[in-house]
């Protein structure tokens, strides 16, 4: 074998040796990666296996408790609203329980007021009228103590919420829209209008 051939042979052997080493390293790397993947899978399986069913049950119970607490709070709020509504309705009923009775009494008051508008010169008539005035005043005071209030009219500005205009007037002594005369008394029970006042309104 010539020196040139021997040199070429040696070079080929060195190249083959390096290639073998490279392949061996790559194979080792692949084996290492595969082993790591297998270890990770094993760890995941172990973690899954380590979860105690009791812990899962506890978590579920906590969740159920929280849901029940929320339901309870909602029901409690609804019940409190219901109680307040009932209390308000009871207070309203109590405040206006005399409404029907007062409505029945109003015509009697009207008759008394009409009688008081009659004038007479007779002493006996004057004495009788004075007695009726006292009864009228006493009756109104008693009704006032129970929440009845007479609606103000003459000289007031017309308010459709409490006044009923039945006649239009043309009086220079009053401003436009001002009440010049009350034709029938109106009454309120606390804030509720039992009957609007019938009035004459200046145009």
From Swiss-Prot:
Gene: grpE
Family membership: Belongs to the GrpE family.
Keywords carried by this UniProt record: Chaperone, Cytoplasm, Stress response
Organism: Staphylococcus saprophyticus subsp. saprophyticus (strain ATCC 15305 / DSM 20229 / NCIMB 8711 / NCTC 7292 / S-41)
Lineage: Bacteria, Bacillati, Bacillota, Bacilli, Bacillales
Protein name: Protein GrpE
PANTHER family, sorted: GRPE PROTEIN, GRPE PROTEIN HOMOLOG, MITOCHONDRIAL
UniProt subunit comment: Homodimer.
Organism superkingdom: Bacteria
InterPro entries (alphabetical): GrpE, GrpE_coiled_coil, GrpE_head
Biased composition (Polar residues): 1-10
GO biological process: protein folding
SUPFAM superfamilies, sorted: Coiled-coil domain of nucleotide exchange factor GrpE, Head domain of nucleotide exchange factor GrpE
Primary localization class, coarse: cytoplasm
UniProt-annotated location(s): Cytoplasm
């Amino acid at each position: 074998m010539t020196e040139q051939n021997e040199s070429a042979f040696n070079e080929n052997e060195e190249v083959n040796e390096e290639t073998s080493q490279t392949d061996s390293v790559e194979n080792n790397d692949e084996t290492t990666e595969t082993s790591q993947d297998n270890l990770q899978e094993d760890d995941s399986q172990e973690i899954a296996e380590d979860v105690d069913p009791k812990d899962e049950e506890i978590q579920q119970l906590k969740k159920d408790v929280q849901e029940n607490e929320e339901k309870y709070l909602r029901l409690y709020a609804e019940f409190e609203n219901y109680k307040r509504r009932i209390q308000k309705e009871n207070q309203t009923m109590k405040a206006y329980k005399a409404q029907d009775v007062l409505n029945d009494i109003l015509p009697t008051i009207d008759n008394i007021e009409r009688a008081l508008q009659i004038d007479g010169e007779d002493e006996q008539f004057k004495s009788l009228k004075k007695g009726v005035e006292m009864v009228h005043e006493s009756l109104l005071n008693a009704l006032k103590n129970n929440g009845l209030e007479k609606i103000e009219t003459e000289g007031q500005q017309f308010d459709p919420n409490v006044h009923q205009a039945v006649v239009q007037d043309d009086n220079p002594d009053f401003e436009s829209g001002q009440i010049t005369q009350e034709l029938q008394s109106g009454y309120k029970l606390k804030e509720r209008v039992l009957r609007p006042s019938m009035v004459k309104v200046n145009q």
